[in-house]
Amino acid sequence: MQQVSKVKTSPTGPEFSQLIQGYWRLAAWEMSPQERLTFLKQHVELGITTVDNAAIYGNSEVLFGEALKLDPTMRDHIEIISKFGINGIATSETEKRVSHYDSSQSLILSSTENSLKRLGVEQLDCLLVHRPDFLMEVDQIAEAFTKLQNSGKVKHFGVSNFSTSQFELLQSGLGQPLVTNQIEINPINFDVLEDGTSDQLQRLKTRPMAWSCLAGGDLFTAETEQAIRLRATLTELASELGATSINQVAFAWILKHPSNPLPIIGSGNIQRVTDTVGALSLQMNTEQWYRIWTASKDHGVA
């Protein structure tokens, strides 16, 4: 089995594993703390040392922290990413509000402190703005980032789901370079490959992180014409490439893009995670990549 290597996210950024383990659905995996720790050790053994979490992911940070507490030495072998900025609807009947974004300095500082406490760690390797806030004040974010970095609570900063203009706006006011933009990339939805987002990151030599690489499972189960076409093409290519699954082919398609994405694996099944690592060994050529593009679009290139 190929070992997942580490790569720099950007010229001044951290080294993360080429595949990232996502913990969004950790609660749904229904694992005991020991089972969570075992899973963590298993994917670290594969070389997947970078883990993705967020303040809004239910109690996933707490559950991850419980596992880490069983073997605190594992902290030295992983890189932890978390996110801030999405406030859910209040549970109190007397406090009526809508889910909203918040990138104020006070929210950033308190959210990060709470993430650190839930995870049971003293420092995040990377903190991301989860979604662009329409009321974003760059100076507020810059001050918060500086405080968090100077206090040793966060090493690096990035964004998630930012457009090119939003990325440039935030970067213009920061004292440190953004090290990534976590964006949706999959064979069903790859708008970021066409709207300038990936072009910007290539120019900056900054790797995107790719979320929803399997389109939330739609590649396997959706009955839309697009999904049916894609499954047929992915199955055909799996045979040509010697892949063990269409899962591998989908990840190989993402990995081939010259922006050099770092795909996030969403499964808590170590067999599925191990299978995904095999995508790194597939040698997909240009024509094969465009066959997936064509199956998604339902037309060829002009």
Can you annotate each of these PLM segments?
Residues 1-79, 301:
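N-terminal binding-site loop/beta-alpha segment at the start of enzyme catalytic domains
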Residues 10-15, 45, 67-79, 116-120, ...:
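Acidic (Asp/Glu)-rich catalytic clusters
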Residues 11-27, 81-99, 123, 128:
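N-terminal small/glycine-rich loop or linker at the start of catalytic domains
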Residues 18, 75-78, 82, 122-126, ...:
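Short acidic capping loops at alpha-helix termini that bridge into adjacent secondary structure
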Residues 22, 54, 127-130, 160, ...:
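Conserved residues at the C-terminal ends of beta-strands
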Residues 30-43, 101-119, 140, 165-168, ...:
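Short, acidic/polar
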Residues 116-135:
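Active-site groove signature of glycoside hydrolases
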Residues 132-302:
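Beta/alpha (TIM)-barrel catalytic core signal, keyed to glycine-rich beta->alpha loops juxtaposed to Asp/Glu
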